Amino acid sequence: MFNRPKGTRDFAPSEMKKRKIIENKLKSVFMAYNFNEINTPTFEYFELLSKKTGEDIRKQLFVFKDHGNREMGLRPEITSSVVRFYINELKNLPKPQKLFYFANCFRYEQPQAGRYREFWQMGCELLGSKNPIADAEVINLAMDGLNKINMDYEIHIGHLGVLKGVFEEFGLTEDEELKIRRLIDKEDYENLEKCLIELEENKNIIIKDIIFSVLNSKGTVEEVIGNLKEILKNYPKSIEALNNLEEIMEFVKRNNYIINLGIARGLDYYTGMVFEVYGKKEGARQVCGGGRYDNLIELFEGAPTPAVGFAYGFDRIMLNIDDFEVEDKRILIVPIKKDKKLLKECLIIADKLREMEKIVEVDLMNRKLNKALNYANTVGISKVIMIGEKELNERKISIKDMETGEQKLIDLEELSNI
């Protein structure tokens, strides 16, 4: 017997129906905002996948060589592929380009609840606009999607330009800034404090209290931005970032958000507004993240292009929504006598119903009627059509509602009413 690879899953039909319902609801929201769906390859050149984060990503990827000895990798996320696609094919089209995707991704990490080696992402990229309303649109879109599927969540919104403005004002070296960024990204505040104290002693500066004032800022727009504008009044780039965040929030249509300047996701990647969404089930796991990344397309050797986007962790979303029943409207057609004439009529009626977009199954097991009804009841089929010779001669069929037990004769012309 073969087992599936570690960190992967099989989805039974009942689970796939639920996943497909949630997928389609989320996609409908992207399309309502006029985002267009695209698809990209499951594997890319390793050079592309490592461009954003460097060689360190290798141990997290599934890397292999093709028959031409070229190094490839299974995609760990979709944005790099979208950027490549944009630079190669879409850069000359009218702006903004509004793209969305839904695809499986792969990371070689230790499997645990809500974390797999194969997982699904759904997300979007809005390319070509630096207008604050573009930032607000992707935040609104992310919230609208989760509201569409009735998920209980909490959204935190921040701006990396505030911290970056502090770094710039103190004239830190590249290595010093990188060390601080990594500690913030890991939320290793104990070692961050030690690092900042050491910097203060070596450079005769006061930076620790400023950094922690930013990281600990959480609350409403008025509370956070008003307070930080006073603390950072001598840091022009930080003030510029706070003004930008304030303008973005004017266009965010709901107020059930938390301004959180402690968000430090992807300090090497994002350039401005960032946000994270946490589900309120399953230990408040993050289910969505995104922000502005105006330097990424240039990093991939394209022309400088402003960009903003986000991705849902689809598997975590499925863990965070309440279980629901899938409405089952399948129909089973059963010939009462097992002869070819009746079976052919069953197939003709099945085709007519399928043309009406009904989900129809014809009994393929030559079951007796009572066993066919038992089968329908076991697998959750909603209606059974029974076709007998006498009824057929009268242009009638018998139909049984498996939920209510009601059975009636109807004219063949009434098929569309089933």
From Swiss-Prot:
The keyword RNA-binding does not apply. The keyword Protein biosynthesis applies. GO terms for cellular component: cytoplasm. One of its GO terms (molecular function) is ATP binding. It catalyses: tRNA(His) + L-histidine + ATP = L-histidyl-tRNA(His) + AMP + diphosphate + H(+). One of its GO terms (biological process) is histidyl-tRNA aminoacylation. CDD domains: HisRS-like_core. Keywords: Aminoacyl-tRNA synthetase, ATP-binding, Cytoplasm, Ligase, Nucleotide-binding, Protein biosynthesis. Belongs to the class-II aminoacyl-tRNA synthetase family. HAMAP family: His_tRNA_synth (MF_00127), HisZ (MF_00125). This is Histidine--tRNA ligase. It comes from Methanococcus aeolicus (strain ATCC BAA-1280 / DSM 17508 / OCM 812 / Nankai-3).
